[in-house]
Amino acid sequence: MRIVLPHIVIRAVIAVILCLLVAELGWIVYGRWFAEGAKPDRTEYPLRGIDISRHNGNVDFAQLQQPGADVGFVYIKCTEGTDYVDPGFIENVRRASRAGIPAGVYHFFRYDTDGELQALNLLNAMGGRDFAPPPAIDVEDWGNPDGHTTALIVERLRMLVDCLVAEGYQPLIYTNIDGYHRLIRGNFDNLPLWISSFSWPPLDTDPDNRHWAIWQYSHRGNVWGIDGPVDLNVVNPIFEDRLFNGNRAQ
């Protein structure tokens, strides 16, 4: 005997399946952007800062310098790839300087372009200025194309780093846990690490917290002077002197 399911049952089954698919997609998005667990202890990590780009809009640095804002430094996006300069870079640097907030700059590293040309783009934009904290290189899969081998990515990143070092800059490497294990660990251990992580300890191979310089612990912070979410960071005290007392080789 053939059993014919009522249309209402079929619709209910389809609705359940769709709900499960939507829930799974939502969980993936939540995990990428919003799932944040550990928070740094304020007494252990008192020096806090943010990183910004044009996507953060018009930043009111006068508000950021207020004691209640709890912003002790700011990283400003400078360049990306071989020819892109963030439209807000110059003005953000000027405003940070006027507000007396220590400002570093960062370069978004592209997997698909030459490392030396990327270094030239960053160096030209910095114009020979010294920054404390020092320049950072943002290394992550997000925003980069697929299809590049680990060896090629590391080779291009090394070219970029070597060019900066040759000009007297001692850069940091910004990355997440996956990027650290795949690209940075064992290749750039001599450079200060800026790790993006939502767990404690921030770096799973560093339970004593002696190998990371900056910890980005949130993508959705709220601070005075910025409309919308902003990345939040803390400095590891054992790296504070190295980061904020000049980085150009003598």
Positions of the model-derived regions?
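Substrate-binding cleft of extracellular glycoside hydrolase catalytic domains
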Residues: 32-37, 41-59, 66, 76-161, ...
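Glycine-enriched alpha-helix->loop->beta-strand junction motifs that scaffold or abut catalytic
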Residues: 68-72, 100-101, 131, 187-194, ...
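Catalytic-site microenvironment of enzymes
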Residues: 98-101, 179, 250
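N-terminal Lys/Arg-rich, disordered targeting/topogenic segments
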Residues: 1-9
